[in-house]
Structures are given as C-alpha cells and as structure tokens.
Amino acid sequence: MSLFEQEYKKLNKLQKEAVDTIEGPVMVVAGPGTGKTQILALRIGKILKTTDINPDSILCLTFTRSGVNAMKNRLLQYIGLESNKVKVSTFHAFAIEIIEKYYTFLDFPQIPNLIKEDEAVFLVDDILENGSWDYLRPRTNPQMYFNDLKSLISILKRERITVEEFEKQIKKDIEFLENDPESISSRGESKGKVKKEIEKKIESLSRTLEVVEFYRIYEERKRESFLMDYDDVLEFVVSIVSNSEDARADIYENYQYVLVDEHQDSSGVQNSFLKAVWGEVENPNIFVVGDDRQLIYAFSGANLSYFEEFANYFGRTKLITLLDNYRSTSRILDLADSILESSISKGKLKSNKGGGESVFLREYEYPRDEILSAGLYFKSLIEQGESLEEMAILVPKNHHVRTANSILKNLNLPVLDQDNLSLFSLNKTDSFLRVLRIIDKPFDSVSVSLSLLDKYSGIDKLEAHRYLEENKKENLSLDNLLENRETGLFANENNIFKWGKTLKSLLDKKDKKLSFLISEIGNIIYINNSEDNHDLLENVEFVRTFIHLALMFETKNLNPTIGQFLNYIERLKTYGNHIDVATLGVSKGIQVMTLHKSKGLEYKYVWIAHMNEETFMSEKRSPFALPEYVRDRLAKRSQEDAKRELYVAITRAKEYCTLSYANLNYTGGELNLASIIQELPDIHFIKKRKDENELELLENSINGPKIFTSSIIDLALEKGESRVLDEINEFVRENYKDTKVSVSLLNNFFECPFKWYFRNFLKLPEPKSVSLALGSAVHNTIEFILKNKILPKAKELESFINQDLRKEGISNDKEILRLSKTASNIIEDFLASFYKNIAKDFSSERSVSFLDKDLGINIYGKIDLTENTSDGRIVITDFKTGKPKTKTEIEKIDEEGRLSAYMRQLAMYSYLVKQSQNREVDISQLFFLEREHNDKNKVYITNIDNEKIDLLLRDIKDYVESLENHHWMDRKCNFKSFGGKNDPCPYCALAKNIFLK
C-alpha cells in the first residue's frame, strides 16, 4: 500500500468528501487543526490518480512561501517526482510569471522588475531629498514618515484608489469643511470665524496633499525605471487578464484544476483575478479552502465578503465544513469557540484528544514580569526534558518580540527568532562600520574615539577611558593613536598603539577591492579574535553577511569606494531596513513571534502575553489626515478583528495554553485586561492573581539569577565586572572637578548619567545633527548681528548663514539651500519681532563663571542676551530653535522634584549673575525662534525666585555627591527620543556595550 493510500484511509468522512469531489466548484470551511494541508495534497493526488490529466495542468495557489514549501514536500511524499510538475505557487509569484509574458499590455517597453527593498529605500530617499516638502521631510527626522508613506500607498493600491481619486476626495473634504455652516463658530470671541478644530482639520488635510504629490512622483519614477512594487503585481495581472482574451485563454487552457489555500485571506484584487479568468466558465474546477474565523489579513485588503462571495459566484458550489480537530484538547477548543463563532458554518470544533488541561489566565504588575514568568516556566520544562521546538511565546506587536527575546536571553534561555537576526541589531555592526569609516577618513574623530571603547580593539577599559579623558580632542585621529608609542602614560607598544597599528595596516589596503578589504577586516579583527567555537561561528556568519553585501554592491557599482558603500549601508539602517545575518545552520530555541505570524504553526506549550486592552486593541495612528471616503474604506481594528487574531493564537496550542496581562505599563500608566477576554466565562480559566505570580518570581529570583534587575551596574556585577566598575567610579571621582559645571552638563546628567559621562566627562566627539547645525548657524548669526549692531542685507545674511552651515559640517548643497532658507526666515522674523525692542544697553554671548569654594567646582554659563533697561532692571534672554514649549512644560517639576531643563537653565543664569555680579535678575525669558506667528508660546517670561535657586543648588549638590560616593551609575535614565521615534537611549546602549562586553 502506497503512502498516499495509507493517508487517504486515515481521513474522516467529510475529509474524504473534500478529497473525492474533484469536479466543479468546491468550498471547504476548515477550522484549525482539521487537516487542511493534508486535504489539499491528497486531493491533488486523487485528481492525478482518477483522471488522465497531466500534473502541469493543476494550479495550487497559496499566500506564503512557507505554504508553498510545505505543499511541495507533502506532494513529493504522496505522488513522487511527478509532483514537481504540479504548479504550486504564491499568488504573487504566479502573477509575476504572467506579467513577464504579457507585459506589453501594461505599456511597458520591457519586462518590469520587482523593486527590491533597498531600491525602494533609495527611491523614496531620493524623492524626499529632491522635493520641496513642507511636511513629509521633517528636519529633525527626515525619514520619519518613510514607513507611513509606504503603508498608506500600499493600502490605497490594495483598495484600488488612484492618485487622482485620492486627491479629489481630499479636496472635496476641504471644500465641504470650508463651506459647511457648522464649521463657523456661533459664540465667544471667535463668533463668525471658522472653528479652531475645523481649521486644524483643514490644515491636516492640506498637508496630506503632499502625500498625493509624493504618490504621483513615486509612481512616475517607478515606471520610468521599469519597476513595480509588491502591490502593483496583482493589480497588473488583473489588468492583463481583464483586457487580454489571449492571456485568459492561456491560463484557463493550461490549468484544468485550481486549488486556493487560505482563501479567507484573499483581497479584492486576488478575487478579481479568479473571477476574470474563470468567471465565465461553466462549473469551473476551482477548490478553495479557508476558515472565516482565521481571517487576520484585513490590513492587506482581505475581507470576509470575498470568501463568502465564492459560494455564489461560480454557480452551484459544494460547501463542506470540517470540525474534527486533531491538534488541540477540548478545553482549548471550547475557549476558542467561546471567543468566536463561524459566520458560514454551524457547529463547534471537536477534539480527538479529549479534555486536557485548563487554560491559565495570569495577572502581573508589569509586562516584563509576564515574559520573565514565561521564561522561568519554559526553563523548568526544558529541565524536565521537553523539546524547545514545542514552546512558543506569542505577543501582539513586533516590538514586543524584540523585548521578549532580550529578556529570555538575559535568562540564558535559547531563543529562535521566526525572522532571521538583523545585522543592524548587533553591536559588532556599529564596531565594523566604525573601522570602515576610519579607513575611509583617518581623521574621523568620532569613529576613532569610539573605536577605542570597542571590545574588538583589545584595549583595557580603564586604559581607553583614561586616554580619552586626557586627550579631549575634537580632532582625534589615527595618527594620534600611532603617536602613543613611546610618550605619555603608556609604554612602548601599549594597547592603544597596537590598535592604531592594526587600523593602519587596514588603511594601507584601502585601494584593494571592497569585498577583499571587508574580508580582511573581518578576519583580522573578528574571526581571529574569537573567544570560543560559538563566538567563532557567530563571527563567521557576521563577516559573511558583510562580504555578501559588498559583493552585491560591487555588481551594481563600478569600482565602488568605501564612502559609497558606507553611505549605502547607513541609508538602509536609517530607514529601518532589515538585513538578515547569513546563518550557517538552524539553531533550536523558544519561538517568540506575533500572534499574527503564528498562523499555520502549532506547539505543545503556548504562552500568549500582553493581553491588555490598551496593547492588544491599539492601532497605530496615521500621521496623515485622510478624507472620509478613504477612511471608511480602510480596515479598522474592530472587536471582531481582535477576536479572530486571539482565536488563531489560542488554537496554536496542542495541550497547554497560558494567557497573561499586566496592570501597569513601564511608565506607570494603568493597563486593563482586554475586554474580549473579560467577556469570557470564568469556567474556561484557572486564574492566578498578581501576588501569587510575583511570589513565584521572587522565589525563582532568590534561587537563581536576579531576574528583577536590569540596570547596567546590576548586569555588570552579574557578569563579574565589579573591578571595572570600581575603577571607573574612582577614575570619575578623581577627575570630575576638572570639568566646569554648566546647565547643559546638569541637564545631561539628570537625563541620563551615561550621557553626562560620554558627553561631558570624556567629551567624546559626536556627529552634529542637522537640527543642531541649524541652531548653531542661527545663534551665530544673531550673535554677529548683536555684537556688530549691523542689519545685514538679504544676500549678506544668506552668505553668512551658508558659510556657517558649512563650518558646522553640512556639505550637501540641497540641504544647505533648505536650511539656509529656514535660517533666513528665522532671522528675519527675529529682526522684525524682537531686535527692534532690545534695550540700548545690552551685551550678547556673555560668559559668566565663579568658583564654588564649598564644593570645589567651577560653575559656568554663557548667556545669549543680557539687557540693562532704562529703569535699572536686568533682563536675561535665551534664544531657542525648535518647537516652542508650553508654560506647563517649562514649569513642570519631575517625579524627583527637579526643575525642567528649561527652567534649570534660567535658574542657572540668575544664580551666575547673582554670584559673579551680586545683582538680581529681574526678568528671565526664553524666546522661541521657530514659533508660528500666532503661537502664544513664542516667549516665556518669568522671575527666578529663591525656591527655584534652591532646587538648582540641590541639583548641583546631588551631582557632586553622587560622583563622590560612586552612586552616579545607579541613576535612572530619563532619555526621550526626538522626531517621533521610539528609540532606546544611545548612551545606555553604548555603556552596556562597553561595560558588559
């Protein structure tokens, strides 16, 4: 008996009916674990065994490459080598084949290529770089809207909304708002005027018109380059089969039998393709299988109506419902059925495994505790001999995956990411790129300085830190490292000199082929210094990835330079591109993935974490205001969507399932259990309260690793790095008084102690951001005007600003043009609104300092503008570029009882004037140079009283005491990223990389 016959005999009655019904349209509603893949494969085998059809006349379409591979493997087992002739393909791959054959119907002169991810990055970057964008390219973060633009354009295409239609609907909404009587205020000061909220809506929609222009340019540039993106593919193929009778006939004649997997995930475009080819065929042999309860691709245009429509569109369709589940226990299936009922079939899933264990619902204080508990649970299972491949943690979002992976790795648990490891997630990637930058530019002081702190430099930590503290240079270069041979603190061939020599040997190979140079760097610095076999394997994989990137870059560019390659890599990194590390083998580990990605998989043990209303039900807000017509057509995250996703997640579990949630987020905000879980009957769960779960965690913490500690100092102590910490602390205590205490120093210290350490203590050079360069150019121009009391003409002003921007390191002519225009507008507004009102007796950019004898430190500040008014008052002004801050933000006292950075600055200036001149500052003000004309926050004015001075002095004393007592590393990091990003603190990341290496 063949394997096919053996497997066929195992089928139940309804499964056999699905396999045996090979003629006409058939729709199978197959719940999770009911043998869907098995049925598809056996049905293809049945067709080949009972008809004289050739294997290449069968078309099987699915949605993922993994689905294609699974089907091909199953067919090979059942049918043998003949199965290779069966056309098993994803929708997109099949569509591309049709496009390659009939591309002339799309008015392409040659076959269009599918745009690669890196090509898309550079195309978008080029459009943003060369366009005149007021909104889409923020100065603080030019790449800010990259993913939002991609996502919105993708959705518009899947909904088949053209550029013209999108623009028309935006203008229609604006016109309606402008003319709607309800838009006019009927009371108060604004009576008769457009309401403020309506003004904001109109302004937001007007900004979205920039997206229209971007969309138009993006499409034009793709077509000019004979490119198509992922969403074009299906639209193009529908256009071909709709307009070409030859193409339709070709497909229909080639494929007598069509099978579609996961049909509930079909989008409107995919459905249109099936209807265009087989819609006019009487009784077509189309077989679709899916489950309405597992529709989780609504974001990509999938809609339940397309699945339901099949039953009626292709004539008398046979409907078969499969409810016998061979995966999960009854308790798991009962819970799943309570969450969601099928809208197509009646009946509940029936388990062939029996009752099984109850599902746990666990409550925790914080989200991190959920993952710690899951990790400890899996750790105990591993110790009992359970297979790692049977364990999975499912979470709502991708960022939860990254956090969970990090926590599990800190528990020394093996983790197998569903996605390959990203090159940009590795610390050694930054190290490698630094070496390349030094070879490209040996006088790159930022890269040279940071390279000394790299693990791979071979330099002792304290030795590197002492060298940097004693050589506080803005222009530290490779030559300085080579000069360190026989002079200074270190003898002859010390580690700093050796590192310089290694870099010099690589610099001497700069003219070699790029891929050869990268191979040399990899071998000399990484592979040859591997600590053990595991480290060697990781380093080989890492270096192979870089060599592969270099080889690809060489094929696209003739004689590429290091600088060009660095620019290529940096752009990919900036835009969040994912580059897989080229792994040599498949490792084993706990699988961590989103609920969405778990579809089609199964595990004995499943832990579903972060089941909070605020987390699970949250949608990413679009930065673009959309017209009502488009909003109504876009998929919204409803209760039903969430239920389907949870249904899929729970039915991944074969025997054991746990759900967990937290009460508080990381910032202390309240969290609640997801409402769709709260609504479920208690009978489905064994509930474990927060105090019970915390007790378990504490017991494990006493008997094992300190799972509640995550500070750098605690992690360093765990890794046996206490000597290094003691040395660094003593090194700081001995030398911190050499650095003057300024308000920027204090602000850095209380934001993040490691920001202070690297910026103010070691004074590591840093690349200057575009915003800082603009701020410096504006401040320098204002200082020039104030000191010389000359109003420059427009051309002179532009020339002065341009020169200053170049001094600040801006070399791109287009960037200079953009920044120069912004700076000129700021200065012109300053001259019109502020300069004319300055007191006659004033001084600008005045440095003030004094020695605090009690603390033994110099306190210092530079005041932008000091005015002595005619009535004897002193007015201090600090000029600020960037978005204006509200009175509340400036006057806010933080949770430690400290002043905001802005108020601390004003308090410092008043204190300095009092100590150095024995005079009181009467008025302290912040003038925001980039405010809108009608912004009430353009100037903040206050008087610094003794209470604020006392808070400033407390900050200074706390600063000194924490350094003297070695407590500064214990301080909490309060870093907040700018420009809409949610990045981790770069200074803490650098510290972890150094102290935990």
Question: Can you say where each PLM-predicted feature lies in the sequence?
Answer:
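Short, polar/flexible loop-turn hinges at active-site or ligand-entry regions and domain interfaces
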Residues: 52-57, 77-86, 102-116, 128-143, ...
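Metal-dependent nuclease catalytic regions and adjoining charged, substrate-binding loops involved
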Residues: 689-707, 910-997
